[in-house]
Amino acid sequence: MAMIEVKHLQKNFVKTVKEPGLKGALRSFIYPEKQTFEAVKDLTFEVPKGQILGFIGANGAGKSTTIKMLTGILKPTSGFCRINGKIPQDNRQDYVKDIGVVFGQRTQLWWDLALQETYTVLKEIYDVPDSLFHKRMDFLNEVLDLKDFIKDPVRTLSLGQRMRADIAASLLHNPKVLFLDEPTIGLDVSVKDNIRRAITQINQEEETTILLTTHDLSDIEQLCDRIFMIDKGQEIFDGTVSQLKENFGKMKTLSFELVPGQSHLISHYEGLPDMTVDRQGNSLNIEFDSSRYQSADIIKQTLSDFEIRDLKMVDTDIEDIIRRFYRKEL
């Protein structure tokens, strides 16, 4: 059985259209015109136990709305989602004991309490037995390295410390599923690496199923077993990082370093489809569709036109592929 099961999930919002001006405002108040906005459209996917799924899309794609339905905050218009065999909107008090949630821009910690006291309060909220609580704290201290600031008030913690503390809070009751929304937002490189290592260790040691939303594509490459991409509430890709690169990473770039003093123009590649040529001084970059053109032919032609000091092939990385998706180029 899948840990996360989503079938034909749909969420519509009804909004009032307001006309401009005083008359328009009065007319809208007396005779409001309603429009239905489809935020999530017929989403279907499953996540098996222990998988880390990168749930990604541009701003406004429907990610947050989907997460709110999966966590039980919003009720679907139609379709359903089931987490660990439970419907999130049914008996939420019991359901939330199966999940942990971290929102990168919001904290679940109490601002004026010491971090250790915050965990004690959460222990009571989640009915965590004393023996399990101490065992969990030992594990989370080791993985997330909380010991240096666990006695400090939450308001004094740095952003990186607070994020580690929030992840620990979400894992205190040993949830089966962890929802991470932008867990590395605003963090410096070294802190991001520490957070990623901690997430990987927790996933491997406890088989925690993780659904990750992020705009940091390094998170996706380093953490995710699979990517589920949506746009305008609909699925546009479901597969592994390697499948994404294989299917959509056909654009490659040949970068040439020219011997100085060559000022003649490039003529062979002008106007060719799926190829762009950019020359800046002694640097010549040719981007091309590798399913349409052979790199060996391009190199041969360029060597006949110019004296070359060096060259290298650059594959399209995941960040560029997803950027092209967002721009509707793929």
Task: Identify the role of each PLM range.
Residues 21-29, 120, 124, 131-149:
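Conserved ABC ATPase "signature" region
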Residues 79-90, 95-96:
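Conserved ABC transporter NBD signature motif
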Residues 112, 153-157:
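Conserved ABC ATPase signature
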Residues 174:
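Conserved catalytic motifs of ABC-family nucleotide-binding domains
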Residues 178-182:
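Catalytic Walker B motif of ABC-type/P-loop ATPase nucleotide-binding domains
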Residues 196-289:
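ABC transporter nucleotide-binding domain
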